[in-house]
């Protein structure tokens, strides 16, 4: 994998670049739609690629490990062949899922013992996996716990990289490994973590453990602390973030890659992100609004369907409503990061618009 930094914004830390992988080229900054179970929920891969214009998607190690399981994936020839997604794909570590299942997991030096949320069966995740396995502590964790958690994540990272360097490319394709910077909301722990991951000379670096309950301004501060230390010539991935405004603020602070379930999950529940602001399509005011969903949108659904029709589908809980909303929102996120390649003046105008509730 090769990352080329093509342009830096003179008025912020925003960057434009290009990521070359065995499965294709990704232009940054980029948003990666979340395909937890090797599918972006409710949307054909064709539409994710051609209508939303996604260049890379994300799949989830935890969920795919449990179902369909490693045996099926290996017999299929890997996640790409199993799912028929031909472009680049990022698989996360499962660390956040372990965090979210805190009631049924136990952390030890060897790894994380947990019970499946599907059938209660017992499992063990060790650091010898992609991405680097980490603990994701809550945003309000006491300092002592955050420091102890970070130390465990750092020891796990060392084991992870040792295994990674001994592993041949699977299915004939190179796999890149991104270390994950933790440290909760403590600037000195974040700085220590960023300095530690630099020693591995990785293909890219991830910033984890944010947007887990801490105030937004604290999240932005942690991004600034970390990106001041991470190498400029490698991509930076902010995990699980976030709203359109969060993404623009992340770009302004030097982040290159983002993922979040918000455009699909919130879309299924009636929240529509548009170039003029955010819509709750369930509200009665849209019942007889026959204007397009988003006149500035890039997906066919933005121009073919009206707000009134989407309101009707959402109220009736029709599957098509969730599909239209999800595709629109993903296309909006992708358009947002594409236009952000020409950044500062445009960003200020967009943040003002995105804060509106229509």
Feature annotation, model-predicted:
Residues 129, 149, 153-156, 160, ...:
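Alpha-helical packing segments of well-folded alpha/beta enzyme cores
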Residues 24, 153-160, 197, 226, ...:
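Hydrophobic alpha-helical packing residues
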């Amino acid at each position: 994998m090769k990352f080329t930094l093509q342009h830096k914004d003179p008025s912020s830390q925003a960057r434009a670049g290009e990521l070359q992988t065995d499965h294709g080229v990704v232009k940054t900054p980029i948003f990666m739609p979340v395909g937890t179970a090797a599918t972006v929920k409710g949307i054909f891969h064709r539409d994710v690629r051609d209508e939303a214009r996604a260049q890379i998607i994300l799949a989830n190690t935890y969920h795919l490990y449990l179902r369909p399981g490693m045996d099926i994936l290996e017999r299929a020839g890997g996640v790409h062949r199993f799912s028929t997604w031909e472009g680049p794909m990022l698989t996360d570590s499962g660390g956040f899922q372990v965090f979210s299942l805190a009631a049924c997991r136990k952390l030890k030096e060897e790894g994380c013992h947990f019970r499946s949320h599907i059938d209660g069966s017992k499992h063990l995740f060790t650091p010898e996996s992609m991405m680097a396995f980490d603990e994701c502590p809550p945003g309000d964790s006491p300092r002592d716990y955050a420091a102890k958690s970070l130390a465990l994540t750092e020891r796990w990272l060392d084991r992870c990289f040792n295994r990674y360097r001994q592993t041949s490319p699977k299915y004939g394709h190179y796999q890149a490994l991104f270390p994950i910077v933790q440290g909760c909301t403590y600037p000195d722990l974040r700085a220590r973590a960023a300095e530690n991951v630099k020693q591995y000379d990785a293909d890219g670096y991830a910033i984890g453990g944010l947007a887990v309950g801490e105030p937004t301004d604290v999240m932005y501060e942690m991004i600034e602390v970390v990106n001041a230390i991470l190498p400029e010539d490698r991509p930076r991935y902010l995990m699980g973030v976030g709203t359109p405004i969060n993404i623009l603020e992340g770009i302004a602070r030097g982040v290159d890659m983002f993922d979040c379930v918000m455009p699909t999950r919130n879309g299924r529940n009636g929240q529509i992100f548009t170039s003029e602001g955010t819509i709750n399509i369930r509200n009665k005011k849209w019942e007889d609004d026959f204007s397009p969903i988003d006149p500035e949108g890039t997906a066919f659904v933005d121009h073919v369907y009206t707000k009134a029709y989407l309101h009707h589908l959402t109220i009736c809980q029709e599957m098509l409503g969730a599909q239209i909303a999800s595709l629109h929102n993903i296309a909006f996120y992708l358009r947002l990061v594409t236009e952000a390649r020409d950044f500062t003046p445009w960003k200020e105008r967009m943040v003002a618009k995105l804060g509106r509730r229509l």
